[in-house]
Amino acid sequence: MNYSGVRETEVVVAGAGQAGLAAAFHLRRVGYEPDRDFVVLDHAPRPGGAWQFRWPTLTYGTVHGMHALPGMELTGADPDRPSSEVIGAYFDTYERTFGLRVHRPVDVRAVRAGADERLLVETSEGTYATRALINATGTWDRPFWPRFPGQEVFRGRQLHSSAYRGPQDFAGQRVIVVGGGTSAVQQLMEIAGTAAATTWVTRRPPLFREGPFDEQQGRAAVARVEERVRAGLPPQSVVSVTGLPMTEAMRQARARGVLERLPLFDRLTETGATWSDGSTVEADTILYATGFRAAIDHLAPLKLREPGGGIRLDGTRAVRDPRVHLIGYGPSASTIGANRAGRTAVREIRQLLRPDLRTAA
């Protein structure tokens, strides 16, 4: 590659989390060479994807649904060790074992149409002219902050769950946790042990799932998310349709009253929250465990979005530009889904770049 100017490559993989590494693995497996035929660019400072930013008290033993990367199992991990350390070390070993040569930290700033049917990927280390893009940029960089009347007058602290570092930061405080997902429940249960009082509010009643989640249920849940993506709507998270798996820790928290949920408040005041029926809750901190949105603003120059606000996909391929594949997006936004999407994207890109292989595996 010529590092003094625009570098040409066959495939750019943007993002080195679960989805990006899975795609890079499959590119190598079918004969593509890193830094010759493809390049992996990662915004994060070190291996681990979004896992490296998880709060220290989230141990590996409490992680919900971590699936191994293709070609290498994660074995012998200490369940009491922080998940950020366990999975960060696993990803690091994976990158080195398969020689994926991830470039980091590299910001992907924009992707535009270039000459000769190539895409121009503008980054902090220069521009790549590529024949295909696998976008695996995830959601971590786009935490979703809901808007409520009175947010500007609340005198306490407001933070997003992405900035949560542990229950010690809430000792003796009155805390309102907003959100009905896995992070909301995990952080609420931790905070309840040190806070003076906790209040849990959600837009809809949370759905707790008892018992095993079989393959048929999993496929049905993914199909519901995929339906939105095929319609060009912003994707829902998979957990929003699968529900929250009830654990023993959750049962105990529910018995203690920690998981008693209130509907979403109507507005914030200087000292807390208020509802339309006149009830109020005093608070020192509002914690928004309200999820994330896809980090895809760099794709804006390609005009891939549909009127509904999302990018319509056929499998992993963007309908408006078949050179662009989104993985870890919508129905593949789970660790096992990301693995499968990485394989699918590589198969379709290989057929795009080598039409003579269209009937191959």
Label for each model-derived stretch:
Residues 73-79:
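A short acidic, helix-capping loop that chelates divalent metal ions and anchors anionic groups
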